[in-house]
């Protein structure tokens, strides 16, 4: 019975709310001095909304109220020219591709023929000089009439002494010996480099009187010394790397042995104290 009364009460409550409550057509914040005409209240909402015929953009010549912005004139006056872009090559070589390959197409087409001719001319001259130098080396001697002054004697090939001595290899058991070994070998290598540079400068000074075609030939003695010195430096670098690796391994072994020794003495002392 109570449930039926509750349902009946809820129905009456909702019916009273729906009959008495209405949504007002207008909301007034404060009453004004002059009341609006009733015709405006009875007007339809569709007649109050007006859609403009056109939308005026700032800068339109037909509308005098808006001035034309300068940015719009600048954008419209600037011609939109197409920019030509070239795909970069995968490999850049000076022989196949000149340094000024980024020039426009007309300039490149106009100067392509002279460049090819100059390249072919330089290539032929280079090959001719190489062939002449090879023939002169095969003969072993150069004709005296081809030079304004007698040719200087070729510098003898100097053999670089070894950087490693047996005395240094015997003192590699300690850290100080390794440091002394590195210092001595570095000093010897530096002295050999200075000697090679001095010899090359002397050879260049003696070749000043040669002809321009012979000046371009490489110095065999300097090349041999540089190659031997480079090999010795590479060997020294490898030896130093091996020494560093051995020192690291020795340090690890010493650390393990030291920790084991300390642990052994600690265990023995603990056992002795327990007794």
From Swiss-Prot:
Residues forming coiled coils: 223-253
Intracellular or extracellular location(s): Mitochondrion outer membrane; Peroxisome
Top-level taxonomy: Eukaryota, Metazoa, Chordata, Craniata, Vertebrata
Family stated for the protein in its record: Belongs to the Tango11 family.
Topological domain spans for side Cytoplasmic: 1-255
Free-text function comment from the UniProt entry: Plays a role in mitochondrial and peroxisomal fission. Promotes the recruitment and association of the fission mediator dynamin-related protein 1 (DNM1L) to the mitochondrial surface.
Comp. bias intervals (Polar residues): 131-142
Recorded GO MF terms: protein homodimerization activity
Pfam families: Miff
GO cellular component: mitochondrial outer membrane; peroxisome
Feature: compositional bias, Basic and acidic residues: 114-130
Protein name: Mitochondrial fission factor homolog A
Chief place of localization: mitochondrion
Keywords: Coiled coil, Membrane, Mitochondrion, Mitochondrion outer membrane, Peroxisome, Transmembrane, Transmembrane helix
TM annotation in the entry: 256-273
Organism from which the protein derives: Danio rerio
Membrane topology: Single-pass type IV membrane protein
GO annotation terms (biological process): mitochondrial fission; positive regulation of mitochondrial fission; protein targeting to mitochondrion
Residues in the Extracellular compartment per record: 274-275
InterPro entries reported in the protein's UniProt record: Mff-like_dom, Mff/Tango-11
Record region (Disordered): 100-171
